[in-house]
Amino acid sequence: MLHLEDDNGRQRSVIANLQKFVYCCLYLRFIKDGSLFLILLGWIISSLCDFIQELTLRYLKKNYLEVGRDNDQEDDESLAIRGLETPIVRMIINKAIRYYQGLILLETAYCIVYHIRLDVSRDICSKPYGFVIMLLIREFTCPVPTAFPSKLLLVLLDILLLFCQIVIINGSLSSSLQNVKLIVKELNAEEEGALNILKLNTWHMDATGPELIVLKNHDKSIPQQADGDDATEITPLLNIAE
C-alpha cells in the first residue's frame, strides 16, 4: 500500500510543478508580447484544471474512502462534501471539458492572430519592461536585427504552454487517492493520447456526462464502474459483474 500512496503523491506533485511551470511560461510570454488577454486566458485555464482536480479528489474521498468513519465526523463534514454524487460529478466534468475545449481554442486562435500581427519594433521596443526585468532569456533587442527570429521564442512558449495545459487537464481528470484511481472512460488517453480530450464531443454525449471508472488497487486493478448510485465491480479476467 505504501508504494501506491507514494505514486499518488508523486502524480499530484508532478501536476503541481507543471502548474508552476505554466505560470512561469505565462509570465515570460507576457514579458515578450505584452498581451494581458493571453495571460488572463492562461490563468483561467489553469484555474479550471485546479477546480477539476479538486473535484475529482473530493469525489473519490467522499464516495470510496469513507468506509469506517464514525457518524459524528461524517455529520460534521456532510455540508462540505454534499453534491458529490456520481450523476452530478459527471455533468460537472462534462461541462468543464466543454469549457476547457472552448478556452483552448480561443487561446490558440488569439495567439496565432496576435503574434502574426505583432510588430516587435513598434509594440515591444517602446515598452521598457521587456528589457530591464528579464535579461537571461535572450530578450528582444532594439532595433530588431533582420536576421534574428524575434518571434521564435513566442512560438516555442505557445507550443510549450499548450502541451503543459493538455497534460495537466488529463492528469486532473485521472486523479488518484490512496488505493483508488478515477478514469474518464471516453477520454481513453492511454490508447488515444492526451490530445484526445480536444476531439471529445461533449455536445453529443449522454446527458448525464462521461462515464467514470474507478480502479481499486489491491493485488490487481479491479475496475469499478461509477455509473450510478451503486457502482458495480467487474472482474477483468471473467468480464462479468459480481
UniProtKB/Swiss-Prot annotation:
<protein>
    <recommendedName>
        <fullName>Vacuole localized DSC protein 1</fullName>
    </recommendedName>
</protein>
<dbReference type="GO" id="GO:0005783">
    <property type="term" value="C:endoplasmic reticulum"/>
</dbReference>
<keyword id="KW-0926">Vacuole</keyword>
<comment type="subunit">
    <text>Part of the vacuole-localized DSC E3 ligase complex composed of at least TUL1, DSC2, DSC3, UBX3, CDC48 and VLD1.</text>
</comment>
<feature type="transmembrane region" description="Helical">
    <location>
        <begin position="128"/>
        <end position="148"/>
    </location>
</feature>
<dbReference type="GO" id="GO:0000329">
    <property type="term" value="C:fungal-type vacuole membrane"/>
</dbReference>
<keyword id="KW-0812">Transmembrane</keyword>
<keyword id="KW-0472">Membrane</keyword>
<dbReference type="GO" id="GO:0000324">
    <property type="term" value="C:fungal-type vacuole"/>
</dbReference>
<dbReference type="GO" id="GO:0044695">
    <property type="term" value="C:Dsc E3 ubiquitin ligase complex"/>
</dbReference>
<comment type="function">
    <text>Component of the vacuole-localized DSC E3 ubiquitin ligase complex involved in the targeting of the complex to the vacuole membrane via the AP3 pathway to ubiquinate vacuolar membrane proteins. Competes with GLD1 to determine the subcellular localizations of the DSC complex.</text>
</comment>
<keyword id="KW-1133">Transmembrane helix</keyword>
<feature type="transmembrane region" description="Helical">
    <location>
        <begin position="152"/>
        <end position="172"/>
    </location>
</feature>
